Swiss-Prot record:
Its main location: cytoplasm. Belongs to the class-II aminoacyl-tRNA synthetase family. It comes from the Bacteria. Keywords: Aminoacyl-tRNA synthetase, ATP-binding, Cytoplasm, Ligase, Nucleotide-binding, Protein biosynthesis. InterPro entries: Gly-tRNA-synth_bsu (IPR015944), Gly-tRNA-synth_heterodimer (IPR006194). This is Glycine--tRNA ligase beta subunit. It is found in: Cytoplasm. Its EC number is 6.1.1.14. It comes from Streptococcus pyogenes serotype M1. One of its GO terms (molecular function) is glycine-tRNA ligase activity.
C-alpha cells in the first residue's frame, strides 16, 4: 500500500531570490534520491515560503523494488587454476560482490567463456530507506551560506525545525543540530508553533497559523487582491512579473493594500518615481485608465488586514522620504553644467588597472568614429555619435544617479535634453547601456547602437589588455554580457562589419592611456559569443563549420547557421556536403602560388567545374548562397569521377588542386564544409 511523505525544513528568513530555486532544487534532489533507491512514487509537490522549504511525495511505495544484477568477472581460463579449482582472481571477484564461489556460472561471450554471478537484493521497507533522506538536505547548494552558533557546518540560513512524516507517522532523523519531529512554525507574528497532523494536512495545518505554504496560491492571492483594488479604485496596476515573484517570496500570508502620496511628486520624471516604488520599496505602480502615473502605489503586507491603516501610513511615510530625495536631486541637478561634469570624469576611475572614465570615453570616441563609417551613417548621425561620445557618462556625477544608480543613462538623456542637446545625442546616452541583460532591449537608433558598440568594444579590449579575462563562470566585469551585446547589435542592425578586420584596426590605434593587447584572446572570446548566439538549434558541427569560415561577419554567420540547420533536413544535404568536404580536404594540399591554367585541362569535367566556379557569385540570402554552392555538387562529383586529382604529372596535379582551391576560397566565405558531419 502506498503512502504520502512530507519533508519540511524550517529556516530563518531566506533571501527572496533563493526561495524559488531552492524549492525546485529540493524537489529534484528528493526525486533523484527516491529513484536511485528504487522507491517508486506517483507525484511530487513542492512548497516554499521565506521561512520554509517543503516537499510532499504522493503514492510512495511501501518498500524498494527487489534488485537482480548480473556481474561479469574474469575469463574462465583465469578463473580456474591448473587443477580446475577457482583461482584467487575468481575468489576475489565473488567476495567483492558479497557472494561465494557457489554462485559462479560460466557464460560464453564472443567465443570465450567468462565468470558470471547473479546477485539478488530484496527491497527494504521505505521507512528504513528514508532514514538516509537527510543526505538530500545536506547536498543542497546555495549562492551564499553561513555558520551559526558554534557549528562548523554551513547552510543558507539557520535551521530551526525538521518535519518528516510518512502519512501520519513522524520519522526520527537528525540533520545538522536538529532532531526531526512533527512540529512546525506558523507566521512569525500571527502564528505559533504548530503540529503537522499528517502529510496530507500540511497546507491546512499551516493555513490555521497564517501561512500559505503553496507559492502558486500566494501568487494567485496577491494578483486577485490587486485586481480587486483595481476595480474598487478604477485604476490599473502594473503587475511586474519579476516584482511579483520577489514579493510572493517575501510574505507568508499576503494582504495587498493601496497607499498614496502627494500629486506634486508627479512633476519628477516617471522613471524616478517608478524606481523609488518598484526597485527600492517593492511597491507596484498605479496608473489611470489612460496609462498615466497616479499618486498611488500598491504594496503587499506579510500578514492579515488587522490595523492595515497604520501599515499604509508607515509605507507612505517611507516612500515620501524617497520621493523627497528624488525631487531634490531633480531640482538641483538641473543647475549643473554638462561640460563641468565631463571635466570631473578625469577623477573617476574606470578601473584601477585601466585608468579613468574620461580616458575610456576618449577611446570610445575614436572607436565610434570608425564604426560610424563602417555602418554608413549619415553626416548628421556621425556628428551626433561624436557629440554623444564626448559626454555620454556625465550623468554618473549627478545627485540623482548617485542615489538611484539604476537610472544611469536614463537621467543622462533627460538632463541632456534640458541642456539643449540634440535628441539623437540624448537618446544615444540612454541607449549606450543596451542591452543591459541577456535578451534585454537593444538600441533603437543607429547613433545609440554605434555608441553602445564602441563603449562595449573598448571595455572588452581594455579589460583583456590588462589580463582581466573571464575564466569559468567568473566574470566580475560582465564582459560576456557586453560581448553578447556587441553580437546582438550587429545582427539586429544587419551591419556587415568584418569583426576580424575591425578588431585588427582597433589594435592599430594608439592611445596615451592604454595599449590594447591579447588580440587572439579577444577574438576567441567574441567567437564564443557568436557560438552561443547560434544557439542549441544549431548542432555543434554546424556551429564549428560557421566559425571556421573565412568570413567573420556576424549577421551573415548567424543567417548561415539558420540556413544550414534547415538544409540539413533535406535529401541533398548529405551528398552535397560530402562532395564539398572532399574538395575542401584536397584543396589543403594546393600550392597557393599556382593559378589555374585552362590549357592544362584534359577533360570536359575540368572545364565545366572551372567555369561553374568562375560563375559562382554567391548573391542573395544565406539560404540562397547555400543553394548556389550545393548546386555545384553534381559538377564536383563528375569532376572526381573522371579526373585523377593527385596525378603523377606535377603540373596537372597542381592545376587540379588549384581548381579546388578556387572553389574553396568562395565556398568557405559561407561555411567550412569539411567541418560538417554527415554520419
Amino acid at each position: 500500500m502506498s503512502k504520502n511523505l512530507l519533508i519540511e525544513l524550517g529556516l530563518e528568513e531566506l533571501p527572496a531570490y533563493v526561495v524559488t530555486p531552492s524549492e525546485k532544487q529540493l524537489g529534484e534532489r528528493l526525486a533523484t534520491f527516491l529513484t536511485e533507491n528504487r522507491l517508486s512514487f506517483e507525484d511530487i509537490q513542492t512548497f516554499s515560503t521565506p521561512r520554509r522549504l517543503a516537499v510532499r511525495v504522493s503514492g510512495l511505495a511501501d518498500q524498494q523494488t527487489d534488485l537482480t544484477e548480473d556481474f561479469k568477472g574474469p575469463a574462465k581460463k583465469i578463473a580456474l587454476d591448473a587443477d580446475g579449482n577457482f583461482s584467487k582472481a575468481a575468489q576475489g571477484f565473488v567476495r567483492g560482490k558479497g557472494l561465494t564461489t557457489d554462485a559462479i556460472e560460466f557464460r560464453e561471450v564472443k567465443g570465450e567463456e567468462y565468470v558470471y554471478v547473479t546477485k539478488h537484493e530484496a527491497g527494504k521497507p521505505a521507512k528504513e530507506v528514508l532514514l538516509g533522506v537527510t543526505e538530500v538536505l545536506s547536498a543542497m547548494t546555495f549562492p551564499v551560506s553561513m555558520h551559526w552558533a558554534n557549528n562548523s557546518f554551513e547552510y543558507i540560513r539557520p535551521v530551526h525545525t525538521l518535519t518528516v512524516l510518512l502519512n501520519d507517522e513522524a520519522l526520527e532523523l537528525d540533520f545538522l543540530d536538529i532532531h526531526s519531529g512533527r512540529v512546525s512554525r506558523g507566521h512569525r507574528f500571527l502564528g505559533t508553533e504548530t503540529t503537522i497532523t499528517s502529510a496530507d494536512s500540511y497546507e491546512a495545518d499551516l493555513r490555521s497559523q497564517f501561512v500559505i505554504a503553496d507559492a502558486k496560491e500566494r501568487q494567485e492571492m496577491i494578483v486577485e487582491q490587486i485586481k480587486t483594488l483595481e476595480v474598487e479604485q478604477g485604476v490599473q496596476v502594473d503587475i511586474d512579473e519579476d516584482l511579483l515573484n520577489e514579493v510572493l517570496n517575501l510574505v507568508e500570508f499576503p494582504t495587498a493594500f493601496m497607499g498614496s502620496f502627494e500629486a506634486k511628486y508627479l512633476d519628477v520624471p516617471e522613471e524616478v518615481l517608478v524606481t523609488s516604488m518598484k526597485n527600492h520599496q517593492r511597491y507596484f505602480v498605479v496608473r489611470d485608465q489612460a496609462g498615466h502615473l497616479m499618486p498611488n502605489f500598491v504594496s503587499v503586507r506579510n500578514g492579515n488586514d488587522q490595523a492595515i491603516e497604520n501599515v499604509i501610513k508607515g509605507n507612505e511615510k517611507v516612500l515620501v522620504a524617497r520621493l523627497e530625495d528624488g525631487e531634490f536631486f531633480w531640482r538641483e541637478d538641473q543647475k549643473l553644467q554638462i561640460a563641468d561634469l565631463v571635466a570631473k570624469l578625469t577623477n573617476v576611475t574606470f578601473h584601477e588597472k585601466i585608468g579613468s572614465l574620461a580616458e575610456h570615453m576618449d577611446r570610445t570616441r575614436v572607436i565610434a568614429a570608425s564604426l560610424a563609417k563602417e555602418a554608413n551613417l549619415s553626416a548628421e548621425e556621425v556628428t551626433a555619435v561624436d557629440r554623444a561620445a564626448q559626454i555620454y557618462k556625465f550623468d554618473l556625477l549627478t545627485g540623482m544617479v548617485g542615489e538611484f544608480d539604476e537610472l544611469q543613462g536614463i537621467m543622462g538623456e533627460k538632463y541632456a535634453l534640458l541642456a539643449g542637446e540634440d535628441a539623437a545625442v540624448a537618446t544615444a546616452i540612454r541607449e549606450h547601456y543596451l542591452p543591459d541583460a541577456a535578451g534585454g532591449a537593444l538600441p533603437e537608433t543607429k547613433v545609440g547602437a554605434v555608441l553602445a558598440l564602441a563603449a562595449k568594444l573598448d571595455t572588452l579590449l581594455s579589460f583583456f589588455s590588462v589580463g582581466l579575462i573571464p575564466s569559468g563562470s567568473n566574470d566580475p566585469y560582465a564582459l560576456r554580457r557586453a560581448t553578447q551585446g556587441i553580437v546582438r547589435i550587429l545582427d539586429h542592425f544587419g551591419w556587415r562589419i568584418p569583426m576580424d578586420k575591425l578588431v585588427d584596426s582597433l589594435y592599430d590605434l594608439s592611445f596615451d592611456s592604454l595599449t590594447y593587447a591579447n588580440k587572439a584572446d579577444v577574438m576567441n572570446f567574441i567567437r564564443a559569443r557568436v557560438d552561443k548566439m547560434m544557439g542549441k538549434a544549431a548542432p555543434k558541427d554546424i556551429r564549428e563549420a560557421i566559425l571556421a569560415s573565412s568570413t567573420f561577419v556576424v549577421p551573415e554567420m548567424l543567417a548561415a547557421a539558420e540556413a544550414l540547420v534547415k538544409a540539413s533536413h533535406t535529401e541533398n544535404y548529405k551528398p552535397a556536403v560530402e562532395s564539398l568536404s572532399r574538395a575542401f580536404n584536397l584543396a589543403e594540399k594546393a600550392d597557393a602560388s599556382v593559378q589555374v591554367d585552362p590549357s592544362l585541362f584534359e577533360n570536359e569535367q575540368e572545364n565545366t567545374l572551372f567555369a561553374a566556379i568562375q560563375g559562382l557569385t554567391l548573391a542573395g540570402s544565406a539560404a540562397q548562397q547555400l543553394e548556389q554552392v550545393f548546386a555545384l555538387s553534381p559538377v564536383i562529383n563528375d569532376f572526381f569521377d573522371n579526373t585523377m586529382v593527385m596525378a603523377g604529372d606535377q603540373a596537372l596535379k597542381n592545376n587540379r588542386l588549384a581548381i579546388l582551391s578556387d572553389l574553396v576560397s568562395k565556398a568557405k566565405t559561407i561555411v567550412a564544409f569539411n567541418q560538417l558531419n554527415t554520419k
